């Protein structure tokens, strides 16, 4: 009988869970290790005053095909809201609510009708934004940061605050002067220029923890509150993982799906294993403010805010809203009461119904290391290492996407596929090697 490999997956975020699923689907035995008590990593849920809340408001777009496939695989498609067509309500202190919506025309013409009626841009702004979108389609090797690219294409301060910032800053979780133009243009091309429906917004209507729980249920063993602090190595192979407290666990292969700083600490000599540049990654916080009112306050499912530290707000249930504050390095250290008051006052300033409603309770969630900053010159590693049975995964690795759920899922799949390809050359009995070779052929 062929013995399938036992693989240790370190990190129960979506990258690790996806890698584990890919391996388990082909018969590999998967041990999942997570140092916290929760599954899902940055896409998880927990209780606040008896309410299960997500650690942050995560959305995907229709172009996030790997994430949508994962949701389908785990049987959660019925719990997913997907816009029939891209449309966003935009709130401002200076004007009544406006809508930016796509038409039925093919991309990129589908945005033109929406721009023509968008009151936060002047006619000249609309023309220049349109020209910048055309330039984004053809500029395949941009230099410098995204803010500089926008300046070179004559984008006004008004266009920045009314269009570019509300969409790009949350997607990249960083100010545009700290983001590479290449990554900014990737977001523009993928969401707005490739397909008319690509920018449709989608999100789960159930707590995010359901996604992670459904994935973990398909693995052989899940070890929560079990930190992996290193790996055992014999020659050119990983033979096990080192656990906190001095214990160890044997494995035939290992997927490490943790942030770059933890990976650097976990590997004795990351550069010697072919994993370089980990010290160059900088993290950016995200803050979410959860507010419970005595009545519904938003009047729509979600909206973008202009000229506000609250970039987006979602009404997740009648009277319960989640305010998302991206690139929140100047807010993450504030006390919870200040963050709750900030969210309340910002909503009251643009929503008369929120100003009249009574706030029942509030809470803030903070992730000081939410995502890496995709700065110019940052080199993201792929899944391979110098050891054929050790791969890495994470939204920060080289998926081509910013640090999003989509990037995490894609990285997990890539790491698993890399192991499949490598496995055919591992020392094993002839029957095992033949079986692995067949698995590799099916995976590819």
Predicted features by range, described:
Residues 24-48:
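Glycine-rich FAD pyrophosphate-binding loop
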Residues 2, 86, 92, 227-354, ...:
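Mid-domain catalytic core of redox enzymes
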Residues 67-68, 72-184:
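Mobile amphipathic helical/loop "lid" adjacent to a hydrophobic cofactor/ligand pocket
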Residues 5-32:
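N-terminal Rossmann-like FAD-binding beta1-loop-alpha1 element of flavoenzymes
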Residues 58-65, 140-144, 153, 194-216, ...:
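Short beta-strand to alpha-helix junction loop
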Residues 187-244:
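Helical element adjacent to the flavin cofactor pocket in flavoenzyme catalytic cores
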Residues 311, 366-392, 396-399:
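FAD-binding beta-loop-beta segment adjacent to the flavin cofactor pocket
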